[in-house]
């Protein structure tokens, strides 16, 4: 039976389950095991700062947890990938006010209103949270996640740049993009730049090709290389010290989705293909395809294994060095596929999107078997986000952030 035959059979099963939109990547109609509501439920949310039924205990390894805590958030839905982060046992959620909570208890550690722009990503570099200033004054600020206090401040220039935005950070640099203002105060072009985290001085600044956009960029730093994708189907690698463009190529698909950089390879989903490129040369090292009429979601490398799902709800585990398949579990038609992953205590966790019956899935990493699903009972189809720290998974969904002790 060929790949197309398998796809048609699976499409019929998906359609029968009411999941036709999943074939387009929407994933809106899958269903699965549902956890009892952690408190409240419905489409409404408690008032900011209000907690819902705290006090879950860690289950046996692989067991379904009860929420340790749950609080309302002000998340606006605009941070595409990095909406929640955990650093040094502090939980940070994008929103206004920006709020930090204790990972174990959910207790509010600090809250700051009007500190950054809407849709700010929670990007950490060497223990500092870097953000664009909410004043739209060209400043980039660094915050201590534990206290919320400003520890760093810099800018690209005085008046020639519009709305610089942080795309990545490491111990040495903060990487930003910004529009270049013309005489009519328009921004037909943009720059990418690196700012020294010690001195606050601009280390390098490179104008990007005309027609590229300052929005829609997803970036990762790996050693001496800054890697990023954009809406114009570009995959680009630059030298972190000089800004020199090492290589760039068209991926064949507009992308601001997540990708991985692992042991000298850039691994990215380009629709039906999952592809790996050499970080230094751009040469393609391996690729493989999912089923016809399907596409891959965002990949993640955890404990040396590449995990990825596709839009017909199959889950894959792959050797990231070779692209060789460890396993492929196509039997999860009745649950929505995860787009974001974490691994805690030997269990693989995945966050779904656009499915009111989705949530945080727990999988056996040896074969992809579904162990359980946590759903907050809200009925919202908003995307789920997850982050992990210690023996905890943090879930963000429908303006609620929930702490799940999982080990």
Where are these regions (language model features)?
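N-terminal secretory signal peptides
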Residues: 1-7, 18-26
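Short, solvent-exposed loop/turn segments at conserved positions within beta-propeller repeat blades
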Residues: 93, 134-136, 183-189, 229-231, ...
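Blade-level signature of beta-propeller repeat domains, shared across WD40, Kelch, NHL, RCC1
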Residues: 381-407
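Short, low-complexity, disordered segments immediately C-terminal to signal peptides
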Residues: 32-59
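A short helix->beta-strand "capping" segment at the edge of beta-propeller domains
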Residues: 54-78
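Short loop/turn segments that connect beta-strands within beta-propeller blades
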Residues: 103-105, 145-147, 197-199, 239-242, ...
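Beta-strand-rich domains and repeat architectures in extracellular enzymes and scaffolds
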Residues: 71-96, 120
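Repeated scaffold domains used in trafficking and secretory/extracellular systems
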Residues: 78-85, 116-124, 160-169, 211-220, ...
């Amino acid at each position: 039976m060929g790949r197309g035959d398998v796809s048609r059979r699976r499409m019929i099963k998906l359609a029968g389950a009411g999941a036709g939109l999943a074939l387009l990547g929407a994933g809106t109609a899958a269903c699965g095991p549902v956890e009892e509501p952690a408190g409240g439920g419905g489409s409404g949310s408690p008032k900011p700062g209000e907690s819902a039924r705290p006090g879950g205990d860690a289950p046996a390894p692989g067991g379904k947890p009860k929420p340790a805590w749950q609080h309302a958030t002000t998340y606006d839905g605009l941070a595409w990938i990095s909406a929640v982060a955990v650093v040094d046992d502090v939980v940070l959620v994008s929103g206004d006010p920006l709020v930090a909570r204790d990972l174990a208890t959910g207790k509010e550690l600090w809250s700051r209103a009007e500190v950054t722009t809407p849709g700010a990503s929670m990007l950490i570099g060497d223990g500092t949270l870097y953000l664009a200033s909410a004043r739209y004054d060209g400043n980039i600020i660094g915050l201590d996640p534990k206290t919320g206090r400003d520890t760093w401040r810099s800018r690209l220039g005085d008046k020639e740049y519009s709305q610089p935005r942080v795309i990545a950070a490491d111990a040495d640099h903060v990487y930003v993009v910004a529009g270049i203002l013309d005489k009519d105060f328009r921004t037909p072009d943009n720059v990418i730049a690196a700012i020294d985290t010690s001195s606050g001085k601009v280390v390098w600044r490179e104008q990007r090709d005309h027609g590229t956009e300052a929005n829609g960029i997803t970036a990762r730093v790996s050693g001496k290389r800054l890697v990023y994708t954009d809406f114009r189907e570009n995959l680009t690698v630059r030298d972190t010290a000089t800004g020199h463009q090492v290589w760039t190529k068209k991926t064949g698909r507009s992308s601001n989705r997540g990708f991985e950089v692992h042991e000298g390879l850039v691994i990215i989903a380009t629709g039906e293909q999952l592809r790996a490129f050499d970080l230094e040369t751009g040469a393609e090292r391996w690729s493989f395809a999912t089923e016809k009429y399907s596409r891959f979601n965002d990949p993640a490398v955890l404990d040396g294994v590449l995990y990825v799902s596709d839009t017909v709800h199959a889950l894959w585990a792959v050797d990231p060095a070779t692209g060789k398949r460890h396993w492929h579990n196509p039997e999860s038609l009745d649950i929505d596929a995860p787009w974001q992953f974490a691994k805690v205590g030997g269990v693989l966790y995945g966050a779904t999107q656009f499915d009111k019956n989705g949530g945080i899935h727990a999988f056996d990493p040896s074969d992809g078997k579904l162990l359980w699903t946590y759903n907050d009972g809200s009925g919202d189809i908003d995307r789920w986000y997850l982050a992990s720290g210690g023996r905890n998974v943090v879930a963000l969904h429908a303006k609620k952030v929930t702490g799940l002790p999982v080990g």
